[in-house]
Curated annotation (Swiss-Prot):
GO biological process, one term: L-histidine biosynthetic process
Protein name: Imidazoleglycerol-phosphate dehydratase
EC number: 4.2.1.19
Organism expressing this protein natively: Gluconobacter oxydans (strain 621H)
NCBIfam families for the chain: PRK00951.1-5 (NF002109), PRK00951.2-1 (NF002111), PRK00951.2-4 (NF002114)
Gene3D superfamilies: Imidazole glycerol phosphate dehydratase, domain 1
Superkingdom, natural source: Bacteria
Similarity comment: family membership: Belongs to the imidazoleglycerol-phosphate dehydratase family.
Signal peptide positions (record): none
Pfam families named in the record: IGPD
Enzyme class, broadest EC rank: lyase
Length: 198
């Protein structure tokens, strides 16, 4: 296992330039600037409720739209997560959380399996929150799951307010990840798989 459980990455393309630092065993601190206000709000919540320390500076082609920026942040965040988690020895591997925010209730289930997958069952009642297209939340979580090599199921069980649904979803993922990356004191540092590898 990577004892520091930390990663710092830089990724530059013709569309985005992203620098991200992630510490899994953090204190929920964040310094986030993606250029998209509501997205920053969600990433801050993700760090806080996951217990991660997150630094992010992203510059993207927002004059076009937010798609490239949001998706590429998901890619880099996933890559950093995968690097920080190391060989996965001694982790719980699975995580589950139900998180309410007023009328909204989202459920997240995570398996740090090495088998990337996103099951997305979230419907938003409007197309935008602030300047952010709500369809981009799925793009973010898909990019994250694929790059982190995890299986992630996110389901909205109830909700009528788009802001509440998004925030409930991000917090649910954060809490599920917090459980999944935590140390299992009974595992004696073993890889949590009958195959011996994840």
């Amino acid at each position: 296992m990577n004892e520091s459980r930390h990663a710092r990455l830089h990724r530059a393309t013709s569309e985005t330039d992203i620098t991200l630092a992630l510490t899994l065993d953090g204190q929920g601190r964040s310094d986030v600037d993606s250029g998209i206000g509501f997205f920053d709000h969600m990433l801050t919540a993700l760090a806080k409720h996951g217990g991660f320390d997150l630094e992010l500076k992203a510059k993207g082609d927002l004059h076009i739209d937010g798609h490239h920026t949001v998706e590429d942040v998901g890619i880099v965040f996933g890559q950093a997560f995968r690097q920080a988690i190391g060989d996965k020895r001694g982790i719980e591997r699975f995580g589950h959380a139900l998180v309410p925010l007023d009328e909204a209730l989202c459920e997240a289930v995570v398996d740090i399996s090495g088998r990337p997958y996103l099951a997305w069952n979230v419907v938003f009642p409007r197309e935008k929150i602030g300047t952010m297209d709500t369809e981009l939340f799925e793009e973010f979580f898909r990019a994250f799951a694929m790059s982190a090599h995890i299986a992630l199921h996110l389901t909205c069980k109830s909700g009528t307010n788009a802001h509440h649904i998004a925030e409930s979803g991000f917090k649910a993922v954060a809490r599920a990840l917090k459980v999944a990356v935590s140390h299992d004191p009974r595992s004696a540092g073993a890889i949590p798989s009958t195959k011996g590898v994840l």
